[in-house]
Amino acid sequence: MARIRLCYVTHGLSSNGIESLLVSIAQQIDREKYDVTFVLALDPDVIPVHEETVLALGMRVIHVCDLDGLAKKRRYASSLRRIFAKEQFDVVHANMDLLNGIVLRAAKKAGVPRRICHSHNSKTQYAVGKGAVLKKLAQRAYRFVMRRLILRNSTDLLGCSELANAYMYGRRPATVIHNGTQLQKFSDARKTGDIAPDLRRAPVHLCTVGRVSAQKNPLFLVDVIAELSKLRQDFVLHWAGTGELYDAVEARVEANALQPYVQLLGMRTDVPQILAGCSYFLLPSLFEGLGIVLIEAQASGLTCFASDAVPEAADVGACRFLPLEIGAKGWAKAVDDAIRSGTHPEVDPARLRLYDIRNTVEELDRVYENRGEKA
């Protein structure tokens, strides 16, 4: 029997949550059953740290242009149509947020029988600053058009949470796929004491991991650390990630003389080892589709603090949700209280197992197997 020709469409295979998920899926999927290709829109600031991983698995990678500007988006759509027509995929699985509309339209025109939209987020980050009103109107128009294209051209609607599904599909029925991770890597690092050697020493270790972007609310996190440093001085926050607000974070850390309390680690591929050396995790995001890094942190034994904009589905027993409205002082007090108590909530093994990458692959396999069959 011929293998199912499966195509993942995404940005460059960087270390962010969505692309790390796709790499984990690639490592677990049945390669005798699936012939896998990645089509990547490699943005200039993306470092494709995982590309060699999928190539080593015998999978193909096809690069198309970046998406900087309208002309390149048109070129991107044209390239997709050519690729899909040539390759004759059985399944196209789009992971490009609202741009999935363009991807799925190209797939339908090329006759791809199964066209999957996967929603990984729960909100659009609207423009701020000069010209924000006009930019926001343009973004809303773009979202309206892309959602129509998605709904008209997809056969399957997937999302990482009910919140992510509502954002992308409105009231249309959609399936929740538990965006999993390789849980064993995280629990094993903790059990064996496999800790990143460059973590700065301190009695109390906090951590955050993720792209340093507006969505993650990083400047608020700096303010939380500033307030926490007034309550106690025995901690350090290990901060893994890079992004467009990295320089602004670094500047605010310096302006508040927080260098003793914040260790900026930049982009890292040893997240299990970083988490293994920490006890508390902070994620004050403005919005999240799920927040898979929270699952990883809880699998590593950390007590987590997340904003109440993060879906409750990310809580597998060791997560406390805090409103952003209580401010940096309120967050700092909550973290300080937890440290003083010395207790850590227990993870629910049954809920955690839902986010094992093997379960994710099983859920997706049921979708992929129905090739050619209208969802």
Where are the language model's segments positioned?
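Donor nucleotide-sugar binding/catalytic pocket of nucleotide-sugar-dependent glycosyltransferases
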Residues: I62, F144-K191
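N-terminal strand-loop element at the rim of the active site
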Residues: R3, Y8-R75, E244-Y246, V367
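Acidic anion/phosphate-binding donor-loop and adjacent secondary structure
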Residues: D68-R75, A166-R171, H178-A202, N370-R371
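Nucleotide-activated donor-binding/catalytic signature segment of Leloir-type glycosyltransferases, i.e.
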Residues: V249-G266
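A conserved mid-protein helix/loop that constitutes part of the nucleotide-sugar donor-binding site
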Residues: N16-S24, V204, T208-E227, E244-E250
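Short His-centered aromatic/hydrophobic patch
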Residues: A94-N100, S119
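Aromatic "clamp/platform" in nucleotide-sugar-dependent glycosyltransferases that forms part
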Residues: M267, L286
